[in-house]
């Protein structure tokens, strides 16, 4: 159990000591991890912090507008890098290579922004499960195992690296962050790219973005899952009228968890599953089938890639 006040005081000191007089860039995604990092760093170094939101083109529906609004007073730099990420992911089908390509692109963008702002340090919202999965070979996280070795920063500051997700939420409460941030559902750093099996294209991302929005609309308020989402897992055969067609298969996943290290599928009512399937196939052209994933973690991970 983390002593919240003690942790906040210690993290503020560590950030201040690590940064010294240097400017620090950080990735602010709007999730609880990066938001807590931003709040701690603001206390520690004030205007030395340069928060950056990277629009990768792999974000949830309406995410960039939400971030602009939520952090309107934070002197946030917004970088439109969608074309860069799709170019970096072209032709890649292996999940591990995807994560590494995304991690490398993030670092190159932060290095570029650091040069523009005079920053020499990088602050990240890495948490303990990220380290466990990367170091254990389960999957590389874009901010740990997916990072390139040849970074140009003097150092990387990771004040949350020993905390689990539920502990980060407690720290968010201790910092007085809004409930919207404190209890926000986890979203992977690589974005929707890890919810597309196979090569990532703009067409596939557009489909999975709409499917994710429908899943969240159907489940978040009523069932309060730890995480829920849709993934594009392949092509299958369907029928429209009397005509056979090949369309996309969308898998829906909704789990309960405490810290993300283990998770159990939510046993959703059939009516809810049917409503989601009907909406996804009716509202998104090209989707022929919807399935619901009931695999716990372990043996599966929560995300598909």
Curated annotation (Swiss-Prot):
Domain GMPS ATP-PPase: 2-184
Enzyme class: ligase
Name of the molecule in the record: GMP synthase [glutamine-hydrolyzing] subunit B
Subunit details: Heterodimer composed of a glutamine amidotransferase subunit (A) and a GMP-binding subunit (B).
Catalysed reaction, written as an equation: XMP + L-glutamine + ATP + H2O = GMP + L-glutamate + AMP + diphosphate + 2 H(+)
Keywords: ATP-binding, GMP biosynthesis, Ligase, Nucleotide-binding, Purine biosynthesis
Pathway: Purine metabolism; GMP biosynthesis; GMP from XMP (L-Gln route): step 1/1
Pfam family, one: NAD_synthase
GO molecular-function term, one example from the UniProt record: ATP binding
Record's function text: Catalyzes the synthesis of GMP from XMP.
